[in-house]
Amino acid sequence: MPALKGKFEFRKSPRTTRRSLLVALGYCLMLSTTLSSCSEAKNNTQESAASPVSVASSSTTEKQLVRIVRSKQLTPLAVLEKQGSLEKRLEPLGFKVQWTEFAAGPQQLEALNANGLDIASTAESPPVFSQAAGVPLVYLATTRPSGKSISLLVPVNSPIKTVRDLKGKKVAFQKASIGHYLLVKALEDAGLKLSDVKSVFLAPADANAAFSQNKVDAWYIWEPFGTRNEQNKIARVLADGGKLRDTGNFYSTSRQFYQAHPDVIKVFLEELEKTEIWTKAHPKEVAQLLAPVTQLDPPTLEKMHDKYDYGLVPITEKVINKQQEVADKWYSLGLIPKKVNVRDGFLTPEEYTKITPSDVLANK
């Protein structure tokens, strides 16, 4: 508070009226109160700086955001957002959920590293590329392996009949994505290498435009892009990843967020697993709920339901070893600059026990 200039002096003078004396006394009282308030505010500020208060401890404090990737697919994560159960669980902890959309897995993990996202949901490959770049991520949970919802598309009138026919052709996919990985495996099964095709790295929206304009010969992509293009008679499915995939998706976070908020992560995984179970058992209701999200009609979504395998599974040595195989594959292809020890991103069994839902742990 700025210093007050001047000096108050009371003289014993007949001119000093009772009124002027009261005015002066009133001003002094106001000054005293103001200085006292300033001093109290200063002390409170110092105390707050010395002893930070949790956002959950005061109803007047703005809630802290937990930023989670938004899913626009037929997934339990999309259902979780629509139903709002996570928000109800986290509110007493002082957290507000913000759902944020990203083009694909690699973009999510870039945001995770830049402190623009707290919880990501990706396939197996994006975390490997992030670890190769030195990102200190943490694998939180994984799902059952399911590749039927990822398809290798060709134009509806394309002469391409088999994967071997892709030799020398332009194939679009998001770099470092599940589409990239399954293309590698599909080509190997057909006796080809990735270098036998012309790779066109495009994010899903850009690849969709290029594919519909016949600027590429094939496209490896996930739902709902595949079904939309089939419905519009733009594409047909050459192959899917059903027999090629032996790892599930991963939920991940930054090491910093995990260490600061294990309670939030535990609540998230509990609500997610409940939603996984509900989604599996209610295909009709899920189709109605997610029709606006996926831009597909409910009957189509009901048919797509069987392309997914629902439920979290425990992170075990088998899961870690399978993920190491993915990392070793990318290194052998020269697509990551160094060997990655994926174990650096996994927690200890004791740490997983603290955050993993009990019914998931029971499936070990």
Say what each PLM segment does.
Residues 1-17:
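N-terminal secretory signal peptides that target proteins for export/translocation
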Residues 18-23:
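N-terminal export leaders
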Residues 33-37:
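C-terminal motif of bacterial Sec signal peptides marking the signal peptidase cleavage site
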Residues 39-42:
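Bacterial signal peptide processing site
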Residues 46-193, 199-201, 217-221:
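Short, glycine-/small- and polar/acidic-enriched structural segments
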Residues 125, 199-200, 205-292:
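Pocket-lining segment of extracytoplasmic ligand-binding domains
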Residues 260-337:
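Secondary-structure end/capping motifs
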Residues 328-364:
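Conserved C-terminal helix/tail region of periplasmic/extracytoplasmic solute-binding proteins
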